[in-house]
């Protein structure tokens, strides 16, 4: 069975990351793909489903998982709630040949690279700051104050783009989606990947 690849996907709010992930999962059935479901200690919001949006656990349960070193990465955010990525769940899905995407920020990405050096990371850039602000306003979800905070945070996040393996400017949604698909395809054609997947064939070809 083919081994799946682990990907980090990061972007400032408004760059189109969530829409791209949804479109990517719905396209090209030649490879299995999924987004990792995180654990959190916060209460479920209306419409959120256990195991689909998050795994909702108590603070005590979360801290027990930390002590057992069962998180690939985790963080305690403003308000005191924990968020984390389960290591056993990731390993299980990768072993099934599923490409797993981690929708996390640059800080989480730094944690994961230390534990999984083979992870591939992708950063989505907006075409410009004015366009990013226009998209945030167009969503109609946030106040002017919150949008200003998101814009300030976006500049900080963008400054870490050079820590990533791939960088894509989301100026044209369909083109960006094709770029993401190309990355997935090319990563399954690397020498390291093929040596693992076709070890027996290579051994047979070199037997004489």
From Swiss-Prot:
GO terms for cellular component: cytosol. It comes from the Bacteria. Signal peptide: none annotated. Pfam families: Guanylate_kin (PF00625). Its EC number is 2.7.4.8. ATP binds at residues 11-18. InterPro entries: GK/Ca_channel_bsu, Guanylate_kin-like_dom, Guanylate_kinase, Guanylate_kinase_CS, P-loop_NTPase. It is found in: Cytoplasm. It catalyses: GMP + ATP = GDP + ADP. The keyword Cytoplasm applies. Residues 4-185 form the Guanylate kinase-like domain. The keyword Signal does not apply. Keywords: ATP-binding, Cytoplasm, Kinase, Nucleotide-binding, Transferase. It is an enzyme of class 2 (transferase). One of its GO terms (molecular function) is ATP binding. Its main location: cytoplasm. Transmembrane segments: none annotated. Belongs to the guanylate kinase family. Essential for recycling GMP and indirectly, cGMP. This is Guanylate kinase. It comes from Haemophilus influenzae (strain 86-028NP).
């Amino acid at each position: 069975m083919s081994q799946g690849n682990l990907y980090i996907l990061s972007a400032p709010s408004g760059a189109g990351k969530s829409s791209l992930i949804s479109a990517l999962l719905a396209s090209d059935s030649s490879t299995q793909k999924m987004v990792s479901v995180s654990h959190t200690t916060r209460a479920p919001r209306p419409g959120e489903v256990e195991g689909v949006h998050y795994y909702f656990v108590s603070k005590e349960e979360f801290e027990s998982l930390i002590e057992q070193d069962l998180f690939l990465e985790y963080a305690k955010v403003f308000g005191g709630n924990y968020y984390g990525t389960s290591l056993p769940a990731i390993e299980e899905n990768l072993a099934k040949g599923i490409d797993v995407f981690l929708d996390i920020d640059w800080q989480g990405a730094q944690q994961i690279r230390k534990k999984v050096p083979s992870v591939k990371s992708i950063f989505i850039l907006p075409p410009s700051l004015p366009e990013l602000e226009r998209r945030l306003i167009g969503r109609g979800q946030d106040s002017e104050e919150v949008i200003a905070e998101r814009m300030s945070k976006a500049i900080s996040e963008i400054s870490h783009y050079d820590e990533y393996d791939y960088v894509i400017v989301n100026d044209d949604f369909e083109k960006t989606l094709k770029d993401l698909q190309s990355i997935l395809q090319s990563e399954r054609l690397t020498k390291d990947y093929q040596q693992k997947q076709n070890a027996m064939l290579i051994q047979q070809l070199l037997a004489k």
